[in-house]
Amino acid sequence: MNKRRAKGKSHSIRPARAGAPKWVRLTREEVEMLVEELAKRGYTPSMIGIILRDQYGIPLVKQIVGKKVTQILEERGLAPQIPEDLFNLIRKAVNVRRHINEYPRDKTAKKGLEEIESKIRRLTRYYKGIGKLPQEWVYDPAKAELLVAGAS
């Protein structure tokens, strides 16, 4: 019945490797400095990982440093206040809501907005549980639009 999440089985698998690859010449400190520098330029954690992969040949920061990109950013005080995946869902909901205001009879978009907002609520519950979001944080569409406008 629930086919929405049953699709999309094709993906790459990370190699099971404990240490850093042989071709990476950067040290642990240099990689941490690169992560910090890219974060100060305004890149998100996922974009930092993509830049390190494509431009510096670092397949996975955790293999070299022993910490994830977000852990490095949290230590340096550069981590985003709202986790990146939640923020991307909020941005998507704002865009769909803007579309619905322009085309109010678009029932498919309304259904999509309901699904996006339910994902936001589930993810919010998870992040409150692990302590990444304060307990009083609530998703509000009006505030979300201001949040997305301020981040752009």
UniProtKB/Swiss-Prot annotation:
Keywords from UniProt, A to Z, are: Ribonucleoprotein, Ribosomal protein
Report one GO cellular component: cytosolic small ribosomal subunit
Tell me, what is one Gene Ontology molecular-function annotation carried by this entry?
structural constituent of ribosome
Q: Which InterPro entries match?
A: Ribosomal_uS15, Ribosomal_uS15_arc_euk, Ribosomal_uS15_N, uS15_NS1_RNA-bd_sf
According to its UniProt entry, one GO biological process term is: translation
Family of this protein: Belongs to the universal ribosomal protein uS15 family.
Q: How does this protein assemble?
A: Part of the 30S ribosomal subunit.
Q: Which protein are we looking at?
A: Small ribosomal subunit protein uS15
Q: Which organism is it from?
A: Saccharolobus solfataricus (strain ATCC 35092 / DSM 1617 / JCM 11322 / P2) (Sulfolobus solfataricus)
